[in-house]
């Protein structure tokens, strides 16, 4: 009985077997892929673009470098990094979900972003890249969906070059009680209804709200990064802590 308990994890507020979570998460993103970008704009009122711009500004990325945009979905960050690294650099858009990758590839090609971008279907816990390969790894709104976050952070550390940086952009814990109450009301009462209205899928957005609540808060995630051997770990609260950007280095 204890072994069974040890092999469980959270899927939103539900407790599930670890080996089933990836398939459950895949079902969510297969469902929302086609409407993912428009839902991001609607649900965040466009603010997600500001969060991502701040992430790019904190990246320190330069021309000619290699970037891994992990759980990169529809490619918002990949598009930005592609322009910065130029034709002598390389951006790898990786996602475990092939539906999201297809949407991202089509979108970036329509934007004329080709040549320095590659697409890889990959599990964050077992990245299929050489050691010490990337100058920068970003994972935006993806870590909370990973089954074994510690294993994923260790995998990211392995493929990052010495001197490289990891940036984790993720929903977090609001800093102020009034904001937290409003955020809870919006998350559990408005998000699912908008999901039903726009994407014909309320359950996936119910999962979104629940998965955010189960994700480690700012200090805990910082300690997890420290435990994965990242150094100089710090975080920046955005929008009152609704989102946080964590940054760590490999030396």
UniProtKB/Swiss-Prot annotation:
Cysteine-cysteine disulfides: none
EC number: 2.1.1.163, 2.1.1.201
Binding site for S-adenosyl-L-methionine: 74, 95, 123-124
Residue ranges crossing the lipid bilayer per the database entry: none
Pathway in which this enzyme or protein is active: Quinol/quinone metabolism; menaquinone biosynthesis; menaquinol from 1,4-dihydroxy-2-naphthoate: step 2/2; Cofactor biosynthesis; ubiquinone biosynthesis
CDD domains associated with the record: AdoMet_MTases
GO terms for MF: 2-methoxy-6-polyprenyl-1,4-benzoquinol methyltransferase activity; demethylmenaquinone methyltransferase activity
Signal peptide residue numbers: none
BP terms from Gene Ontology: aerobic respiration; menaquinone biosynthetic process; methylation
Catalytic activity: a 2-demethylmenaquinol + S-adenosyl-L-methionine = a menaquinol + S-adenosyl-L-homocysteine + H(+); a 2-methoxy-6-(all-trans-polyprenyl)benzene-1,4-diol + S-adenosyl-L-methionine = a 5-methoxy-2-methyl-3-(all-trans-polyprenyl)benzene-1,4-diol + S-adenosyl-L-homocysteine + H(+)
One Pfam family linked to the record: Ubie_methyltran
Assigned keywords, A-Z: Menaquinone biosynthesis, Methyltransferase, S-adenosyl-L-methionine, Transferase, Ubiquinone biosynthesis
Keyword hit for Transmembrane: no
Function: Methyltransferase required for the conversion of demethylmenaquinol (DMKH2) to menaquinol (MKH2) and the conversion of 2-polyprenyl-6-methoxy-1,4-benzoquinol (DDMQH2) to 2-polyprenyl-3-methyl-6-methoxy-1,4-benzoquinol (DMQH2).
Protein family according to the UniProt entry: Belongs to the class I-like SAM-binding methyltransferase superfamily. MenG/UbiE family.
Protein name: Ubiquinone/menaquinone biosynthesis C-methyltransferase UbiE
Organism: Psychromonas ingrahamii (strain DSM 17664 / CCUG 51855 / 37)
Gene: ubiE
